[in-house]
UniProtKB/Swiss-Prot annotation:
Claim: Zinc-finger is one of the keywords in the record: no
Alphabetized PROSITE patterns for the sequence: RIBOSOMAL_L33
Keywords linked to the UniProt accession: Chloroplast, Plastid, Ribonucleoprotein, Ribosomal protein
InterPro entries in the cross-refs: Ribosomal_bL33, Ribosomal_bL33_CS, Ribosomal_bL33_sf, Ribosomal_zn-bd
Pfam families: Ribosomal_L33 (PF00471)
Keyword hit for Plastid: yes
Name of the gene this protein is made from: rpl33
Cellular compartment(s): Plastid, Chloroplast
Main location: plastid
Sequence similarity: Belongs to the bacterial ribosomal protein bL33 family.
Protein name: Large ribosomal subunit protein bL33c
Gene Ontology biological process terms in this record: translation
Length: 66
């Protein structure tokens, strides 16, 4: 078996609603989740619906660059 890049990589998911709002008086931060993805099965950016504690609802979280 060839030794190479790891198949599973760590990614960070960020709430797109908080990012669009920018600095809002109600929102005190930006929701981020840390997870892993399989590089072979998901070559594109990961997009999941997760709970944002700052928006207080389920929103779309996209993968961001480190």
């Amino acid at each position: 078996m060839a030794k190479g890049k790891d198949v599973r990589i760590r990614v960070i998911l960020e709430c797109i609603s908080c990012v669009r709002k920018g600095t809002n008086k109600e929102s005190t931060g930006i929701s981020r989740y840390s997870t892993q993805k399989n590089r072979h099965n998901t070559p594109g950016q990961l997009e999941l619906r997760k709970f944002c504690r700052y928006c207080r609802k389920h929103t779309t979280h996209n993968e961001i660059k480190k």
